[in-house]
Amino acid sequence: MVVLITRQHPPEVTGYFAFKSYLSTILNENNLSSAFLEKYRVLAFPLMNPDGVDLGHWRHNAGGIDLNRDWSVYNQKEIKTTVDFISKTLKENDSKLVLGIDFHSTYYDVFYTNEERASTSMPYFLDNWFSSLESTIPNYKVNEQPSVSKQPVSKGWFLNAHKAVGVVYEIGDDTPRDRIKIIGKESAISMMKIMLD
């Protein structure tokens, strides 16, 4: 199973635009997407923080909490509901979560990844994915910043709770909209090809 989430932080809309392009590509109903969806279930959460968005908050929800710091504590309803739904879906379908991507925005395009890869179900996925992105997106250089997840953030939860590859996929605030569509589309195509290989 693959999990895609976005809008934990309300104003980070360029990440949401990449999420839309990514998800639309997966649901494209062509041979590649059909084969991928035959093999993998995708759970997509397009608005993790509806109250924060509605209230115009910068990083937190209606309770004043940054949702991307609650992924092992589960004090916030948004995270608890999401985690419960993912867990229920995995159990009902006897599935395994292999990849989780959390779309955000920041000053520039960057992928925040976990240093730990060997213990995941796809230890070479990121290397293959990033190599593919650089070869398919014109003038694109992957900016990866791996770290050990010490805070209760989504990428750490994907790794620690499920041994899945976890990525925080950040799009630059000023990345042009047409470029975001290309990056989102090519990222999804590359992911599907790698995971079907």
Regions picked out by a protein language model, each given a short descriptive name:
Residues 68, 109-120, 145-197:
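Active-site-adjacent mobile loop/cap segments within catalytic or ligand-binding domains
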Residues 1-135, 139-143, 166-173:
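Active-site/substrate-binding loop(s) of hydrolase catalytic cores
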